[in-house]
């Protein structure tokens, strides 16, 4: 205790007995696949369907594609209440559309790769104030198909390039715009960009390799590659998610029967994850007809909505788990089929009286560990591990002694108590969790190796059943 001699106000630094742990987000997802345009090979986060259109469809009214389920899945995610989503866009050997006009020798290049750029047309017309001797100004219009365009007025030979490349709308579509060295005056003309390609057909390995985009993301939990249903891809998703603490959502192949789904489900296992079935039908703006699409994106949105609105420990199933955006399902599951699929961990997507289309099943892909039987078990477990791991980073480089152990224990217990009082853990504090960080799991040998070991147990359902989590931090030896 400090000794103070004179009257006054004194400030003293005191090391807190515990640190505050912020609960990690578990509602952020990533969808991987082919988009109309956008950055390729690097996942980018978006917060709305409108932002997807801007970044991955060049602002077009119809961002949907005949050869990709990804845009439909993204639409399903946001329609169902998802808030934050990474897009992992992939293409193989794709080319940007480009052209050099014959009249003005203008070279224009599309902003991103893809056949979409072949719909870009550039038109130069004399402005209303054009005068051959005093005002040689033009209006330049850049259009993408018939659905969207922008007109930049009163440009001249000296200003046209900068005007196009700095226009907020035009630069969504055009990345390069330049005049030939010999161009000394502008003239009216229209020309179209060409030779844009979506690249060669993607192989299973391309989708598997695309999972590496997640390596640099630290806030993703939910993972899906919509409509890609080969065993190679699904096995890779399960393995990647198991190894990286993520929650996979798989799709069955289009047209799969209940029996085929049952057989496939029994052939796989994972720490956690979801296998929804069957596919759903939604209105397709491309054809104005119903299109049958995979359910992974829609289900991901329902999960994200439930986590944010009700809590990570609330099952995303039942009459509250309404699936928005589907007009009907590929086929209606019978009660007998549901009673067969639900117990083995298939999330049945079905229509219920007075509720509409809902998720009627909350069991996960873990068929070996009874403590991870439900979707909520896996999501809560992943959330606790990430929250505690991130929240105990303060311990790194600290002296590995009893004082540190006490602080870490108090920090972890405070976080777990918050979960208990929110309803995520059951029972009294003694029944709901425990934290061990002492000389029983931090021996002289482990301390010499620079390790801090923390063991946490918690009871998500039954107070007598504990799920064990062991964390290890690498700490410089003292």
Summary of predicted features, one role per range:
Residues 1-117, 130-137, 143-145, 206-478:
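Structured, hydrophobic secondary-structure cores that serve as assembly/anchoring elements
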Residues 46, 152-154:
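Conserved aromatic
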Residues 118-128:
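Broad, structure-driven detector of short, well-ordered beta-strand segments within folded domains
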Residues 147-151:
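Surface-exposed loop/edge segments in extracytoplasmic proteins
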Residues 166, 173-179, 412:
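Gly/charged, well-structured mid-domain segments that form the phosphate/adenylate-handling core
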């Amino acid at each position: 205790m400090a000794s103070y001699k004179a009257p006054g106000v004194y400030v003293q630094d005191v090391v807190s007995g515990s640190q505050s742990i912020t609960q990690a987000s578990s509602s952020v997802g990533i969808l991987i696949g082919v988009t109309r345009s956008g950055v390729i090979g690097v996942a980018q986060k978006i917060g709305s369907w409108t932002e997807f259109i801007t970044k991955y469809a060049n602002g077009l009214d119809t961002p949907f594609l005949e050869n990709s389920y990804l845009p439909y899945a993204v639409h399903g995610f946001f329609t169902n209440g998802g808030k934050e989503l990474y897009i992992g866009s992939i293409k193989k050997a794709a080319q940007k559309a480009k052209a050099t006009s014959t009249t003005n020798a203008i070279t224009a290049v599309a902003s991103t790769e893809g056949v979409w750029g072949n719909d870009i047309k550039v038109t130069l017309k004399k402005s209303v104030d054009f005068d051959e001797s005093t005002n040689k100004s033009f209006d330049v219009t850049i259009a993408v198909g018939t659905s969207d365009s922008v007109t930049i007025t009163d440009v001249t030979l000296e200003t046209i390039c900068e005007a196009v490349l700095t226009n907020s709308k035009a630069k969504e579509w055009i990345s390069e715009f330049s005049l030939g060295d010999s161009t000394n005056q502008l003239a009216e003309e229209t020309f179209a960009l060409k030779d844009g390609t979506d690249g060669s057909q993607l192989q299973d390995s391309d989708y598997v390799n695309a999972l590496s985009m997640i390596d640099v993301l630290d806030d993703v939990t939910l993972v899906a590659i919509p409509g890609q249903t080969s065993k190679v891809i699904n096995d890779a998703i399960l393995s990647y998610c198991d190894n990286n603490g993520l929650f996979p959502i798989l799709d069955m192949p289009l047209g799969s029967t209940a029996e085929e789904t049952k057989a496939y489900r029994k052939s796989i296992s994972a720490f956690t994850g979801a296998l929804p079935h069957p596919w759903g039908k939604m209105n397709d703006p491309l054809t104005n007809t119903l299109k049958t699409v995979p359910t992974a994106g829609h289900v991901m949105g329902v999960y994200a909505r439930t986590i944010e609105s009700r809590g990570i420990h609330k099952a995303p199933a039942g009459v509250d788990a309404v699936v928005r955006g589907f007009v009907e399902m590929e086929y209606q599951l019978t009660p007998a089929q549901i009673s067969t699929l639900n117990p083995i961990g298939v999330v049945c997507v079905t229509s219920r009286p007075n509720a509409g289309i809902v998720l009627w099943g909350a069991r996960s892909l873990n068929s070996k560990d009874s403590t991870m039987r439900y979707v909520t078990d896996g999501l809560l477990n992943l959330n606790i591990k990430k929250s505690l791991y991130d929240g105990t980073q303060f311990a790194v480089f600290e002296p590995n002694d009893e004082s540190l152990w006490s602080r870490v224990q108090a920090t972890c217990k405070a976080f777990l108590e918050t979960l208990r009082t929110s309803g995520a853990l059951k029972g009294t504090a003694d029944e709901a969790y425990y934290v061990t960080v002492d000389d029983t799991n931090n021996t002289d040998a482990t301390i010499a190796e620079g390790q801090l070991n923390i063991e946490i147990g918690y009871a998500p359902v039954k107070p007598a059943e504990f799920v064990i989590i062991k964390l290890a931090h690498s700490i410089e030896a003292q």
